[in-house]
Amino acid sequence: MRRVVITGMGAITPVGLSVEEFWNSVKEGKTNFAEVTRFDSTNYRAHMAAEINNFNPKDYMDFKSAKRMELFSQYAVAAAKEAIEQSGLDMTKEDPFRVGCSVGSGIGSMQVVEKSCEILNTKGPGRLNPLMIPLLISNMASGNVSIQFGLRGKNINVVTACATGTHSIGEAYRTIQCSDADVMVAGGTEAAITPTGFGGFAALTALTSSTDPERCSIPFDKERSGFVMGEGAGVVVLEELEHAKARGAKILGEGVGYGATGDAYHITSPAEDGSGAAKAMEWAVKEAGISTDDVWYVNAHGTSTHHNDLFETIAIKKTFGEHAKEMKINSTKSITGHLLGAAGAVEVITCVKELQEGLIHQTVGYKVPDEQCDLDYVGNGNVKMDIKYALTNSLGFGGHNASLLIKKYED
């Protein structure tokens, strides 16, 4: 199999509109949790969100293009722009059919659905926007990124709910390994903080009942009550190693393992025995040709819901055995909230930065240990630790499990 490296990264998040801003916030433990501002949440079961502030699509694309995209697509294009620019990829020197795109969204545009339903009910079907469908469908994240940057290779959209970003990068990784592309622009995006999107998750009792910004997103903490809904995008440029070397690209990290499984258990809850997530982790580690004892850090899915954090802990212990007690486990969602389809991609970026700097970020807000979640969740500040591998997990509604193993790059 061909080696696959990361040569560019881009992020649009509630705590920073670039990888640098985002990473600085992560290191500082800076969050952006507050009551929803985009609509009145008085009658909702939940009130806290991690909204993106000060995003201007015209900073990343022309006005005409922005007008023909919904917010989730705009986030994707913005993150892709940063990633491609960092990679130094020059499409005038590439075979465009060897450069592909795999940027997914778990939901697409709830905004268009809400507006269209209102128009349909008040003005009739004749007044619906002719672009309604291409605006709302989730594959337009990948479609718009490919159009904006001239990517004519394999162009796919993975939709696996909260595992979308991780699966998107994993499938892009496989695509390059199998010689179906030399470069893939991959990641996830989401912008679903709307009355219906927020209300749906609240009705499911998935969102936190807390209104305390310091205690609303607290993965693995005994007092956790649900996740904080966030939004944003994460995109990476994946590249075949020799292709990257030939053009003098700076290599940020290397993908060395990908595991993907299904629970076949429940539409929202992970399997209680953790077997599906455990097998995904096991396969990712096995592909790299290393022992589970060689992995000392897991960036967990860690949503701050009771079921996820408990069953993911069980899965980690099932995979790593006694070694799990010695490992560091954290959750980036303690800082960003849950970015849904974008979460896994942003967490891959987090892993790359941690490997580069030898720093594992704290799980912000973690205070009260849960006797059932009994691992080291990095609750007392960042940890300086020179690690070689970072394993990141994503678990999506429907029983979708994905794990990626990222390695500190060595020639």
State each model region's role.
Residues 1-65, 242-254, 349-363, 407-411:
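ACP-dependent fatty acid/polyketide chain-elongation machinery
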Residues 3-7, 34, 212-288, 297, ...:
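Condensing-enzyme catalytic core mediating Claisen C-C bond formation in acyl metabolism
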Residues 6, 27-160, 189-198, 292-308:
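Conserved beta-ketoacyl condensing-enzyme motif
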Residues 8, 26, 80, 101, ...:
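Conserved small-residue
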Residues 76-89, 138-142, 146-149, 154-190, ...:
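Active-site-proximal alpha-helical scaffold in enzymes
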Residues 83-95, 244-250, 281-297, 319-323:
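Phosphate/pyrophosphate-binding loops at sites that engage ATP/ADP/AMP, CoA/4′-phosphopantetheine
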Residues 122-129, 167-170, 174, 190-246, ...:
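Glycine-/small-residue-rich "gating" segment that lines the acyl/pantetheine channel
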Residues 180-225, 258-272, 302-309, 326-376:
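Acyl-CoA/ACP chain-elongation machinery
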